[in-house]
Amino acid sequence: MDKKTSRLRRAIRARKKIQELGVNRLVVHRTPRHIYAQVINPEAQVVAAASTVEKAVKEQLKSTGNVDAAKAVGKFVAERAIEKGVTNVAFDRSGFKYHGRVAALADAAREAGLQF
């Protein structure tokens, strides 16, 4: 089994457990160049989203693939979710290790007011 398949299996397993709880989830996806975050409700509708592809986020950054970019995305997605009335979420790391950019995004979202 290759690295990507292992990550996807971990992601599916964790996602099913979160769906059983029936709570909003903060989903993270990362590529070498960008990082994406979405808050999704139990009915699979996107409540809030932010990524380094967006102009509002990108213009504040020097690079889009580092920890500082992840912190900015975490802050933006948390602010947008709170505007929509979502404060409690489950963190769905999509099978990625809780380290580096994924951890930075989570910490920034917590500091901005999301609870998980």
From Swiss-Prot:
Write out the transmembrane intervals. Answer: none
List the GO molecular function terms. Answer: 5S rRNA binding; structural constituent of ribosome
Q: Name one GO cellular component term.
A: cytosolic large ribosomal subunit
Entry-linked Pfam families = Ribosomal_L18p (PF00861)
Choose any GO biological process term that the UniProt entry carries and state it.
translation
* Disulfide bridge positions per record: none
The record's HAMAP family line, in alphabetical order, gives: Ribosomal_uL18_B (MF_01337_B)
Q: Which NCBIfam families is this protein grouped with? A: L18_bact (TIGR00060)
UniProt subunit comment? Part of the 50S ribosomal subunit; part of the 5S rRNA/L5/L18/L25 subcomplex. Contacts the 5S and 23S rRNAs.
**Free-text function comment from the UniProt entry:** This is one of the proteins that bind and probably mediate the attachment of the 5S RNA into the large ribosomal subunit, where it forms part of the central protuberance.
| Name this protein carries in UniProt | Large ribosomal subunit protein uL18
Q: Which gene encodes it?
A: rplR
